[in-house]
Design a protein with these regions (language model features):
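Core alpha/beta structural scaffold of self-assembling particle/tube/pore-forming proteins
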Residues: 1-57, 68-70, 76-89, 93-350
Length: 350
């Protein structure tokens, strides 16, 4: 009898098409889905030049134009890669015992590999909004439940989406990891398997992530303007903190819809043309309620199978799609001109 698919099944690999992985990765992560991708980031680093000033040899007086001339202002960010790993470990007996519809609802290999892909995806999607430090939350309150357990309340409840049962955490500068035993997603509280030694206001990291993660929007568009000691991928952005480090607009004293229009006007003043604004679901709900019957919804399509529902607002340089993203920090909106943003990776990410 010839070797056939039935007898050789144990040696065959589970096949994942690019389309399947894309669907798993993008469906709940709008910014990750919508940002342009460059997947050939080889070599040691990548030089990203930016022109932030034009020649200043100009005057109504020729002699002054000549004597005051300057060259164009250029700086180059030197990008480097970050690694991130997600492991799926499956005992061979489990793989064999779960094969076929009669033996299990889901084959073990598919179940666990899908989970690892989702873990890597969540890490990347969260990091795209981060500053590179790896912080996924801040301790708001801490209580020792027993001699061997700590109950941690997050400073921002909405950050609870960044945490999972079984996750190993570090707090502040400590390198001893503690595991999450249980989570209350309504209150932003989780219980650890041991006393953490953490204090309030300390940042929280997945074990091994501190200062090792991709630099996302919070790094490229910092909430505080870069100062004289700034060094960001080899660039001191303080020479023009707006053109090299983005625009900061404080709309905390304004109604949300007015804050967004004000931010759009501020970006337009600097020559930008924002077309998408990412916000947290909590803030998106506030915007829906504030607009009431005036709300105008828009569907943002990434491909025929993946799309997101947003709200359309009108800025001074055109319509802006406000899209909710669970990975965006609460109380922060990122208003972007999408054609100037790109995710660089060595192969597909994740």
């Amino acid at each position: 009898m010839a070797l056939n698919m039935t007898t050789f099944a144990a040696a065959l690999k589970q096949h994942y098409t690019d389309e399947k992985i894309e669907n798993m990765v993008y469906k709940d992560n709008p910014f990750l889905a919508m940002v342009s991708k460059y997947e050939d980031f080889g070599g040691e680093n990548l030089k990203l030049p930016v022109k932030y000033g034009i020649p200043m040899g100009r005057s109504a007086t020729f002699a002054d134009a000549v004597s005051n001339k300057t060259a164009s202002q250029l700086k180059a960010f030197l990008l480097t890669r970050n690694s991130d790993y997600a492991i799926a470990s499956i005992a061979n007996e489990t793989i064999e015992a779960s094969k076929g519809n009669a033996n299990a609802f889901i084959e073990a290999a598919t179940f666990e590999i899908d989970g690892a892909i989702e873990s890597a995806t969540r890490s990347l999607a969260i990091s795209l909004y981060g500053d590179g430090s790896g912080s996924i939350g801040v301790v708001g309150a801490l209580a020792t439940t027993t001699a061997s357990n700590d109950t941690v309340t997050l400073a921002t409840i909405q950050d609870i989406t960044n945490f999972e049962v079984g996750m190993q955490l570090n707090f502040g500068t400590a390198t001893t990891n503690k595991k999450i035993d249980s989570i209350n997603r309504d209150t932003g509280v989780f219980i650890l398997d041991a006393a953490s030694g953490a204090t309030t206001t300390e940042a929280i990291y997945v074990d091994g992530d501190k200062d090792n993660m991709l630099t996302g929007l919070a790094g490229w568009l910092p909430s505080t303007a870069p100062g004289s000691t700034d060094s960001f991928f080899g660039v001191n952005r303080s020479s023009d903190s707006t053109r090299l480090g983005g625009i900061r607009f404080d709309g905390s004293s304004l109604p949300l819809e007015e804050a967004l229009i004000g931010a759009a006007a501020r970006v337009a003043r600097e020559g930008g043309k924002p077309d998408v604004c990412f916000i947290n679901y909590n803030n998106f709900g506030d915007l829906e309620k504030a607009l009431g019957s005036k709300v105008s919804y828009v569907d943002v399509k990434v491909n025929p199978e993946i799309g997101f529902r947003g709200i359309l607002i009108h800025g001074p340089r055109g319509p802006i799609k406000v899209v909710p993203d669970q990975n965006c920090p609460n109380g922060v909106a990122y208003m972007l001109q999408m054609d100037v943003w790109k995710l660089y990776s060595l192969g597909k990410a994740p």
